[in-house]
Amino acid sequence: MAPEIRPTPRNHSAILYQSNCQNLYVLDIPASISLAQHPRVSSGAAHVDNLEETSTIFSCPPSEIPYSTEPKGAKAMLRVMESIPSCELEYRKQIATFVRETMCELRTNFVGEYCLPRAVQPRLLQRPRKRGRVDGDATVTNAQCSIEPDLSITATCFEADAPPLVLAPGVNMLPGLNSIQTVAVKNNSISAAILQVKNYYTTSADENLLEERMGKTMPFHTERFRVPPQATFVLTHLPTEPNHLPELPIIFFNGKIFDFILMDPPWPNRSVRRSAHYQTTPTFNHLQTLLCGILERNLRPEVGIAAIWTTNNVNSRSTARESLENSGLQVFEEWIWVKTTSKGVPVSPICGLWRQPYEVLILGRKPSNTQDEKPTVRRRVIVGVPDIHSRKPHLKELVEQHFFNADYLEGYKALEVFARNLTAGWWSCGDEVLRFNWDGWWA
């Protein structure tokens, strides 16, 4: 049976609730991604192309009941507590208190659904760790097509002053993803463009090339990717190893400057290293060097705003803060994504020792010249029912609402680093930048 699909809300907003003081939001995550495929979501612009026909991104069923990941037994809990620095315990206590108070306010003032009905495609599988070879002829079955494609590219070789690839309206054919790696791919149109890419079923892109040269016919089919209006992306491995960091200045081509930079770094984490979803960077130090380099070269001086997602790991949070501070920025806000069930209950204990039901986005900007002392950090809560692994709430609507007024909305420049989907009007970069713009993810 085909999945039941509910269109994106007609008011063109993923915000299901917001408090009067704008410190508390309920945000539908799939809708936030779907609406980010169109320019100026929050501007109310009447001329936005086909917004009434916004596609719906496939999702997973919402969580219905909370769970606990706490250590079993008093001894295990004590060992975990002893491993956490006292400053981290104090920070978690502050966050937990703020979240509890905010959730209490939400239950008082909001009566409604915490997420919209989701389009769930049961045959859509996330890609496995390794792709097996497909033998035989080039015919591909429907079952194979329902698997998320392998988007891996070969090792990046940066090319200074490489010209951008400007997409034509409609369908653009590509021989493979390697043909566009490290190239700025632009859709200058007010309508979405399509990339149609040849995709081989082998375990290695290098193996594809070798067997092509040997004259063998490799099984393949084409994958389609949607490029939103006025979006630009760079498909690339961001340099995180020390011997590659000197190549950083030429990644973004001719010193492109942005008003807003959003980063979701692949923080080193044992559980993530065991996962098949993505590889993490080798060390926090290497990652900090990369983050600082991007901020120093690509964030607009004086008025630019940077935002870095962190995990509930003291090292990721300190690295994010140090990256902002070492780039001349000052932390001024924290946005706390609280993960809840469909009924608005946190998915795990707020004061959990092993895992917390929230992630924190740290925002920084240049300090005011008239500022004599460190300002109070403003906190906001974004309540959202988790989606599939690695998807976060898309923040375009909130960013535009808080930082770019109607006069400036038309011309601000934004960049998402380590992106997993494209955004209308923004630049995006990373080795998974096309992942959720694969046509198979969309109803």
Ranges and model annotations:
Residues 1-263, 267-292, 313-443:
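Class I S-adenosyl-L-methionine
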Residues 302-311:
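Conserved beta-strand signature within the Rossmann-like core of class I S-adenosyl-L-methionine
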Residues 295-302:
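Helix-to-beta-strand junctions that scaffold the AdoMet/dcAdoMet cofactor pocket
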